[in-house]
Amino acid sequence: MQHTVPTNALRFLSIDAVQKANSGHPGMPMGMAEIATSLWGKHLNHNPLNPHWFDRDRFVLSNGHGSMLLYSLLHLTGYDISIEDLKDFRKLHSKTPGHPEYDIDIGIETTTGPLGQGIANAIGMAVSEKIMAAEFNEDDIKPINHYTYAFLGDGCLMEGISHEACSFAGTHKLGKLICFYDQNGISIDGEIENWFTDDSIKRFDSYGWQTICVDGHNIEEIDKAIVDAKNETNKPTMIFCKTIIGFGSPNKSGTADVHGAALGEEEVIKTREALNWDHDAFKVPQEAYDFWDSTKKGSELNLDWDNLIKTYDEKYPDKSAELRRRIKGDLPDDFENSFKTFLSECDKNNTPMATRKCSKACLDFFVKELPELIGGSADLTPSNNTFSSSSSTFSNENPSGNHINYGVREFGMSAIMNGMVLHGGIKPYGATFLVFTDYARNAVRLSALMEIPSIFVYTHDSVALGEDGPTHQPVEHMVTLRSTPNLNSWRPADLVETAVAWNEAVKSKKTPTCLIFSRQGTSAISRTEDQLSLINKGGYLIDESDNSDITLIASGSEVQLIIDAAKELKNHSISANVVSMPSLDLFLQQSEEFQSSIINPDKPILVVECSHPNSWYRILNRKDKVIGIESFGESAPGSELLEHFGFNTENVVNSAKSLLND
């Protein structure tokens, strides 16, 4: 086996950075160096001088703890990561945090670290490539023509999301997805044969993947496997790479000791001797830089594509204009006016119905207007109402379909959606019941962390869903979503608020959105033009009284309840301001002046929402009150449960009177 200077440059930059930080994971970079050399040195099409080049190959490091391998590759190939940045590994505000964080300006395609999600992101990228290729490619010109590559490890395949996502990928024959499994047999606790004895080859065969086995330290074998993977166009490929974790370390290779800790000064010296590396820390010989420099080749590939696009402009001007718009992430020029017309129609024709049905009515507009809007559901399409009048099912026979049946895979769906957004050119939305956000939670969190505008649709939003009982009735879930930084949640009351919520979601550039809808019917609320214009602020006055005694606030299906309660309070000589709060998150982003214009801080506040009350204390004083739910639900008809938990006019009126009497 030959271990070249360029390959060992990867190893020792990783070793030295982890050693300097006295923190990190050197074992994986040392073990996967040959795999990286083969892929990045010969096959990966990318341009370090233009990381945003749209037809670049995507690379995902799913085993994100090995981040120094990626940072070393980016530095050596010519991205904006310097030796000083490598020396700052794991320091505050550095370009090189402990796990890779999405930053396409320096070549990092996605945030990884929570194991398994990277492979799901990569699958999402491959889905976007397949959809866009079907939409834009012509027989003579193919502007969308790239591969998605992913590195992953034993931990990724132990995580359940790997099953969800990889099964999905095989079903959809994602032939331009090529993955490399670092099969080193070691995790933090030691040798995995004590807890992970799956026959992973048979596992992936059963998914419908091509499986190839190689010596992970033999560059020639790896190179041939990549060629074979590219030649298989109807299956994703998993290349099983037998490796030695911490390769080159005389005393720690092949052990858990090298997984997540610096080698130590003495072992670093011995590793240098073992691999004949006579260079000081962070010193890379010129021959390694010469080998790795990808700026010239990348620029040439990028220029070839630019020229292809010019020809595409000439032959297919309409498609080319649409592709350019999609790459930029802009909405169509006439979209704003079209939405204003649609919103006016919603206001004029507002009728009582479940907000999940309101969402379907809105999707009939949005999906028709926005071809980049790709929907889906985790096997709840009829319940979530995600299939619009202009939807068609994505399949191998219909790769340009705009609705994906994800199966019962909430976590996989959410992480795949994130990958679709990261790819660009696609705006995905995916749905399940609100209670099952627990399954999807970490992918939703990562979308917020990455500042990408995934759209998560959650229906059946309270105990009012009824007989399915507490396993399906959300209570604490909106609190969790609302407490997540950079995540906007909406719980609209009717068709008009639903339309505004959807519009804000599709306009978003850096913030994911959760759209939360009811199973049961809701009322249609009358509004003035001024009230209509304030919905996108997150909260607004539905009814305002001079010299009001109290402010009633609600979201979603409870808005009509507080409207009715306010009318009843008038019979008791109590005047109430009524506030609809479809998005507490957005309301809290407004100025204090605006918030005070909606909620009088000098008057008592009563909030009514069919969920756990903890979200609301950010806008309340000690003596204010929330009518909410602090226990699990029960199995019964929804109307009975609402009465049982006090969501009725009488209880709201009595609570308001009690609050005023305290």
Write out the residue ranges for each language-model feature.
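A short glycine/serine-rich beta->alpha loop
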Residues: A17-P26, F54-S62, D105-G116, D347-N350, ...
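A glycine-rich helix N-cap at a beta->alpha junction
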Residues: Y79-F89, G170-D182, D205-W209, A448-S462, ...
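Cofactor-binding active-site loop characterized by glycine-rich and histidine/acidic residues
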Residues: G31-H172, F387-S388, M420, R527
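Non-catalytic terminal/interface segments that mediate subunit docking, oligomerization
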Residues: I309-P453, Q531-Y540, D546-S548, I553-G556, ...
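A short, small-residue-rich loop immediately preceding and capping a beta-strand
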Residues: A21, D57-R58, I108-T111, I141-E159, ...
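Thiamine diphosphate
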Residues: K91-D103, N121, V127, I131-A134, ...
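N-terminal capping segment at the start of a domain
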Residues: A9-S23, Y181-N184
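Anionic-ligand anchoring segments at beta-strand to alpha-helix junctions in alpha/beta enzyme folds, i.e.
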Residues: D80-G107, L373-N402, V578-D585
